[in-house]
C-alpha cells in the first residue's frame, strides 16, 4: 500500500461542478481534467498553498444528577483550499472573482457574487485532492509587492447525493494522457 504525504502543490485545476455527474472515480476525474473547458491555474504564489480542515466543534450534554457527560453532538469543521494566484489574465480573475473579463480588461460585478467550482489539486507526490463542489471566495491581495488573487475554496455538499464533498486519488488511478 502506498504511503501518502500529500506535500506541496504541483498542479491546480478548476472546472464546472456539473462535470461531476456521479460518484467520482479516477476515470471520471481524468475525463474532467482532459476536458477543454477545465482550466489550469498557471501560477501559485510562493508559500500560499494549503488545504486545511477546521477542528470539529462539539457540544456536550451533562446529566444533572451525576454531572457526567451522557450525550455529545459534533459539527464537522469546514475543509478549504487556500492559495494566491500570483500571475493571471483577466479571464482567470473573472473566473475566481466574478465580474466580466476579457483579454485586456476586467470589471467587478455589482453586489455579491456567488462562485462555485470543482477544484482539483495535484500534490508534488502525485496525489489528487478534489472538491467536486466548492464555494469560491476571492479577493485582491498584496503579496511581496504585487497584487495577486487570494482564493479560499471551501468544500460544499454536492447536490447529487452520490457525490461526496472530498476525494483523494493516487495519480496512478487518473488517466490524463
Where do the PLM segments sit?
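Solvent-exposed edge beta-strands and adjacent loop segments
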Residues: 2-88, 132-146
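Glycine-rich loops and low-complexity Gly/Arg-rich segments
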Residues: 75-78, 106-111, 144-147, 154-158
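Beta-strand secondary-structure signal
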Residues: 80-84, 118-120, 150-154
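Charged, amphipathic alpha-helical segments
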Residues: 85-108
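Acidic, glycine-rich flexible loop segments
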Residues: 103-141
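Mixed-charge, glycine-accented linear interaction segment located at domain edges/termini
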Residues: 125-177
